[in-house]
């Protein structure tokens, strides 16, 4: 059965060890300060062989989108210098290295794919045209598993396995 949990670390701490086959955490860890603690809890909660699905901002994709779509080289330079990204709806997003965040945990990256490889670079003028979404989806799906495309995407989707 599917169970959606919305809450805090306290709620996670109240759950039994190895009680989940799959945990989804999409576009969350950029907005919390204690991501290492959260990842440790996810590891505890996953059954051996369980999967953790993480979607996160990709710093390379953020810089590309800022230069190409927003036409704001100074903001892109600030991002390159380590400044956090102010998002439209979620607030301050802090970049992080997923490999470093899980290096001492019983989690291993199995695979990753790019999300919004080209979408985030397109002018909004085109996005309302008939057939645009279908064509863009076809293009995104054609490259989402392939480097270098997945490495420049705005978001990346990681699949990690609990050992």
Please place each PLM-identified region on the residue numbering.
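General small-molecule cofactor/ligand-binding pocket signal
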Residues: 3-5, 110-113
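A short acidic, Gly/Pro-enriched loop at the edge of an enzyme's catalytic core
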Residues: 13-23
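A short SAM/SAH-binding and catalytic strip from SAM-dependent methyltransferases
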Residues: 21-35
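Conserved class I S-adenosyl-L-methionine
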Residues: 51-79
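Conserved SAM-binding strand-loop segment of SAM-dependent methyltransferases
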Residues: 1-14
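Short alpha-helix
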Residues: 88-106, 112
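A C-terminal cap/extension of S-adenosyl-L-methionine-dependent methyltransferases
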Residues: 111-163
């Amino acid at each position: 059965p599917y169970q959606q949990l919305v809450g805090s670390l306290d709620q996670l701490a109240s759950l039994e060890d190895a009680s989940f086959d799959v945990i989804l955490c999409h576009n969350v860890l950029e907005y919390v300060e204690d991501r290492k603690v959260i990842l440790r809890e996810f590891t505890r909660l996953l059954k051996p062989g369980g999967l953790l699905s993480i979607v996160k901002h990709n710093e390379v994709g953020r810089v590309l989108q800022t230069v190409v779509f927003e036409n704001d080289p100074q903001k892109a330079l600030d991002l390159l210098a380590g400044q956090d990204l102010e998002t439209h709806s979620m607030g301050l997003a802090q970049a992080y290295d997923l490999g470093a965040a899980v290096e001492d945990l019983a989690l291993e990256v199995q695979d990753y794919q790019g999300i919004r490889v080209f979408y985030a670079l397109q002018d909004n003028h085109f996005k309302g045209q008939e057939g645009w979404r279908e064509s863009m989806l076809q293009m995104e799906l054609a490259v989402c598993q392939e480097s270098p495309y997945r490495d420049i995407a705005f978001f990346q989707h990681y699949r990690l396995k609990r050992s």
